């Protein structure tokens, strides 16, 4: 290095080509280092005038050392780091040792590491080598909020929001907004496709809306990565089809019996485990049937051809099972008439298969029978004639029996529609028992409009299967309707007997019916519309266990209906078993 000293007024810009530098004091005198003299820093500092003004954009102080070279910025940056290291080195060594003893496990491997660390800490300060260890830092709340905000306004999240908001009458508007989004990667398109697929197979009421929107996006909805590849097909639509077939070709087991290990478990734990298993099974069934409906909907809206349906039928007919039979029936219910026009051989194949494999008990018999009746009725209404090659052509020939059955089916559908549109929405605004009185006129009107026995049967069916409104309906019957809708033409015992015979079906589709049905019996018995013998005949296994919550509620509120159903011995036994 050069021994030449530089004055404070030297223009650094004039020395850009020079690479030599020296360390000076603020007065421009060369700095002499004396590592043995611990007071050197203090002596240099005493020479500095308090009136000295330093341009911090060009100079940096560390112990009054000033860097004045073309490399001063880099050196000053290093000195800043050195200052931080000096501060770290002042940590109490004894506290570090104590912390290490606590944090490190005392195994053979960690003993060696601990001894080495302690030995280094005991060395003179100048001899310790400082190793910077990087560790994952937990994000602050502001950083987390920032990430959430960035995610919220990403194109992917906006696209999901559009699918959540879309309505059937505004599909063109939402499709334009989605197509204008600039999604970058294929992975984002796959994530969006997965999101849309789950909505399509679980939200049955909006399936047609989603299908029509998908049809618009089918060809042109591409991300930047896809556009660069120059592919004609879209990752979004291809992913939807792949997810659909994957769901259809699963090993479906949603109709199988559930086995619960009762060992070392309380009754409450067993009931909870059964309830969770039933909910999981119901979700699997909903998704499987939803995938079939989605496949048929794509065909009905001319978005895909019949190939996917044929592949589905071929797969489901390979291995007989009650689940596969139910899914085949779903194909006919959703798209039978449309398929019968140009692909009657596919309808013929499904009908032949479900007829020859109708061996899975009364539940599947009912499903198959209702499917065929619905198919006949829709084909007749649409004036579609079946080809002579269809071996089930005789199913679609009109006769008086079919007309009579069709009338009954239409009446059942009208009653269900009346409940869905007139009764159930009104129950949503009833929060107290007194509020239920407002619904009496609506229910009596329906009772007088339709077949009375059939109407009461549907009423009690909703009590058993509707988890949200079932309790309100039976309270309404018990308090206001029991005397109004009961007459010689309505046999309450026979109606509830019909429901009891279908409980195996309800247990699968509506797990809440396991509790709702026994509780309904208690409410009906409290009105005196069934005798003790009829009440006992309508009971199910573990009846008292299933009504214990209702008994406790009535007992704690001194409800008079409790003693109309049970005697004192029964009440004490049920209460003490809680």
From Swiss-Prot:
InterPro entries per the UniProt record, alphabetical: ARM-type_fold, MIF4G-like_typ-3
Pfam families registered for this protein in UniProt: MIF4G
Subcellular location: Cytoplasm
MIF4G domain: residues covered: 156-378
RNA-binding listed as a keyword: yes
GO BP field: regulation of translation
Gene Ontology terms for molecular function: RNA binding; translation initiation factor activity
GO cellular component, one term: cytoplasm
UniProt keyword list: Cytoplasm, Initiation factor, Protein biosynthesis, RNA-binding, Translation regulation
Keyword presence, Cytoplasm: yes
Family from the record: Belongs to the eukaryotic initiation factor 4G family.
Subunit and interaction comment: Component of the eIF4F complex, which composition varies with external and internal environmental conditions.
Described purpose of this protein according to its UniProt entry: Component of the protein complex eIF4F, which is involved in the recognition of the mRNA cap, ATP-dependent unwinding of 5'-terminal secondary structure and recruitment of mRNA to the ribosome.
Identification of the protein by name: Probable eukaryotic translation initiation factor 4 gamma homolog
Source organism: Enterocytozoon bieneusi (strain H348) (Microsporidian parasite)
Organism placement in taxonomy: Eukaryota, Fungi, Fungi incertae sedis, Microsporidia, Enterocytozoonidae
């Amino acid at each position: 290095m050069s021994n030449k000293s530089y004055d404070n007024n030297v223009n650094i810009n004039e020395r850009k080509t020079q690479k030599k530098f020296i360390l000076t004091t603020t007065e421009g005198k060369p700095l002499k280092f004396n590592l043995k003299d611990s007071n050197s820093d203090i002596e240099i500092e005493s020479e500095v005038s308090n009136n000295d003004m330093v341009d911090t954009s060009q100079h940096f102080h560390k112990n009054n050392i000033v860097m004045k070279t073309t490399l001063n910025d880099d050196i000053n940056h290093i000195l800043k780091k050195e200052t931080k290291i000096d501060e770290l080195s002042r940590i109490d060594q004894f506290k570090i040792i104590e912390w290490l003893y606590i944090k490190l496990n005392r195994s053979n491997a960690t003993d060696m590491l601990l001894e080495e660390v302690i030995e280094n800490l005991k060395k003179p300060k100048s001899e310790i080598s400082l190793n910077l260890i990087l560790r994952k830092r937990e994000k602050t709340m502001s950083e987390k909020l920032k990430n959430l905000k960035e995610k919220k306004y990403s194109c992917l999240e906006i696209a999901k929001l559009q699918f959540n908001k879309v309505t059937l009458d505004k599909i063109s508007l939402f499709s334009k907004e989605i197509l204008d989004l600039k999604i970058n990667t294929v992975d984002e398109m796959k994530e969006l496709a997965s999101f849309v697929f789950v909505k399509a197979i679980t939200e049955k009421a909006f399936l047609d809306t989603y299908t029509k929107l998908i049809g618009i996006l089918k060809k042109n909805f591409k991300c930047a990565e896809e556009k660069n590849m120059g592919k004609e097909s879209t990752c979004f639509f291809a992913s939807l089809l792949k997810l659909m077939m994957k769901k259809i070709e699963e090993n479906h087991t949603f109709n199988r019996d559930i086995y619960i290990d009762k060992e070392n478990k309380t009754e409450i734990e067993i009931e909870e485990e059964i309830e969770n298993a039933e909910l999981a099974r119901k979700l699997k069934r909903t998704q499987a049937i939803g995938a079939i409906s989605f496949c048929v909907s794509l065909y009905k809206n001319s978005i895909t051809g019949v190939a996917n349906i044929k592949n589905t039928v071929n797969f489901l007919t390979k291995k007989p099972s009650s689940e596969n039979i139910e899914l085949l029936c779903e194909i006919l219910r959703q798209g039978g008439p449309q398929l019968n026009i140009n692909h009657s051989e596919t309808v013929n194949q499904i009908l032949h298969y479900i007829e020859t494999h109708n061996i899975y008990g009364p539940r599947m018999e009912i499903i198959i029978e209702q499917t065929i009746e619905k198919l006949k009725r829709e084909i007749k209404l649409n004036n579609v004639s079946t080809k002579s090659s269809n071996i089930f052509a005789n199913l679609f020939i009109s006769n008086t029996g079919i007309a009579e059955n069709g009338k009954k089916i239409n009446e059942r559908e009208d009653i269900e529609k009346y409940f869905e549109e007139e009764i159930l929405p009104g129950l949503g605004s009833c929060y107290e028992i007194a509020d239920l009185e407002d619904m009496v006129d609506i229910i009596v009107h329906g009772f007088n409009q339709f077949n009375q026995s059939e109407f009461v049967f549907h009423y009690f069916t909703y009590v058993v299967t509707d988890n949200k409104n079932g309790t309100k309906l039976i309270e309404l019957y018990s308090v206001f309707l029991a005397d109004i809708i009961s007459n010689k033409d309505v046999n309450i015992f026979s109606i509830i007997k019909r429901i009891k015979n279908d409980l195996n079906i309800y247990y699968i589709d509506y797990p809440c019916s396991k509790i709702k049905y026994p509780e309904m019996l208690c409410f009906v018995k409290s009105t005196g519309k069934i005798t003790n013998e009829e009440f006992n005949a309508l009971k199910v296994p573990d009846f008292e266990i299933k009504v214990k919550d209702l008994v406790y509620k009535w007992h704690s509120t001194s409800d008079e209906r409790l003693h109309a159903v049970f005697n004192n011995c029964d009440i004490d036994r049920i209460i003490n078993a809680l």
